[in-house]
């Protein structure tokens, strides 16, 4: 027996199928086979069926998308830049709904989403990652470096609830006006002592009482706009900055507020923060809304907190994301898009009442 014939080195390597071998088996030209896969040309149904059958027989999955990208001059990737870690971002129902909207908008184009995070190392990675367009979601006001890098690369930029910047297509939400509506609702009920529990104002997620200095240094565009909306009604309303948009963060912020002051209403900058506020109030023996009115923002479905029907502003996060995705595709096609501002709807729930 010839041992050499049985060694791995001597074993014949399987021949990898390619477009040419598929075309030969199907009895067509390589260009016709390519069109059968891409669907971009006039290929009859019978010819396409013959090509796909040959590909299946040879276990050929189709042309390398990298080659297609090179020929088109595009990567087929739309980047989405988040201001926080992916894990934290996916804890926020609004981020998920916005991403869902973006994916819905770009799906028919064949593009894929690539999630990126905005951190200290971002400008370096932004210079090399292959992208056709980029969507910035709720990123901090320190966006100039990232925008500069993407602009230098000629990559179209869409910003969802970001600080207005030249060269960035803005898809915004009426954060200031919506917060003013919430505050006005409380004032109409008779409240004059409202305190805010805000979203984080910096990348370190520093908690504590809101000061004018912290407001001036705020890196959180959405949080700052919502603060301004409340201040349009309650000019001197105090605030406490939460560490995140979570129930636990809302609980700890509200516990600190209620340990030091006795407001008749708390304006939470997200619904999940509001749930934490309500839990802290109950722990301190306060009834909502009899002793303390609480409002939120977003209009998310709050599982496991029944029978709470939160007074809040309902924002169209999916539609906002869809507009961002459509805007990115339009910019790629050289179409000039106009900025858009989405409006939130007021929902009167069971968590607000006149002060005692």
Where are these regions (language model features)?
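Alpha-helical recognition/docking segments in bacterial nutrient-uptake
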Residues: 1-5, 14, 77-81, 85-187
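N-terminal helix-turn-helix DNA-binding module of bacterial transcription factors
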Residues: 1-74, 356
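Hinge/beta->alpha junction and helix N-cap segments in small-molecule ligand-binding domains
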Residues: 84-97, 118-122, 171-181, 196-253, ...
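Periplasmic-binding protein-like
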Residues: 131-138, 195-197, 240, 261-270, ...
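A charged, well-structured terminal subsegment
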Residues: 142-154, 188-191, 195-205, 322-343, ...
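Short acidic capping loops at alpha-helix termini that bridge into adjacent secondary structure
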Residues: 192-193, 237, 288-293
